[in-house]
């Protein structure tokens, strides 16, 4: 992934999940992982760990980045230190079509509220889905199939006090208690150090 014309690039989203009992190994590779992200920081729009329900322990990651094509995107993922070290239990790579980004304001206010990654299958969407609290929206977009022809999932990163507020702010018709609709998920997320810190 050398220097190329950024206007010729597509966006991709990669969601990873760590294997069980790998936290110690993850810490050993973390510095190399952060250096890798800093190396490509001009291509990365958002990146950071997915956290457990307590918002403390990393259990995976989510990154939106630019690449020339699917092969270039796969190369970015496969050369990432966590991937090479065998720490990742699963990797989901999709094309991404972003709608908006409000990253600076979100960074400024992240201390007063957490960030949540919300995803919902396109098949489970219904008329009237919307954002009840647009001020809490950091970014949104659609994951796409490998040929960039079909949307597969609606993705939103939102700022909220807890998962219940995130659920209500994204899709007001989601139940406040109980399980999310089929094909939907809300997980805690935070901006990664490699992206929010100086190179």
Regions found by a protein language model. Give the residues of each.
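Conserved, structured core segments of small domains
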Residues: 2-199
């Amino acid at each position: 992934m050398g220097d190329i014309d950024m206007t010729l690039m597509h966006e991709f989203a990669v969601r990873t999940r760590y294997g069980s009992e790998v936290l110690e190994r993850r810490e050993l590779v973390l510095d190399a992982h952060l250096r890798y992200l800093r190396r490509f920081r001009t291509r990365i729009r958002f990146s950071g760990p997915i956290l457990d329900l307590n918002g403390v322990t990393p259990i995976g990651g989510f990154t939106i980045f630019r690449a020339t094509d699917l092969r270039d995107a796969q190369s970015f993922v496969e050369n990432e230190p966590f991937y090479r070290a065998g720490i990742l239990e699963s990797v989901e790579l999709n094309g991404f079509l972003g709608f908006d980004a409000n990253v600076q304001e979100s960074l400024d206010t992240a201390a007063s509220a957490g960030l949540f990654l919300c995803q919902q299958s396109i098949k489970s969407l219904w008329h009237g889905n919307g954002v009840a609290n647009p001020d809490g929206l950091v970014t949104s977009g659609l994951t796409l199939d490998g040929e960039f022809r079909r949307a597969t999932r609606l993705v939103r990163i939102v700022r909220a006090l807890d998962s219940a507020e995130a659920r209500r702010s994204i899709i007001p018709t989601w139940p406040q208690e109980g399980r999310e609709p089929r094909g939907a998920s809300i997980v805690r997320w935070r901006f990664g150090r490699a992206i929010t810190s100086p190179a």
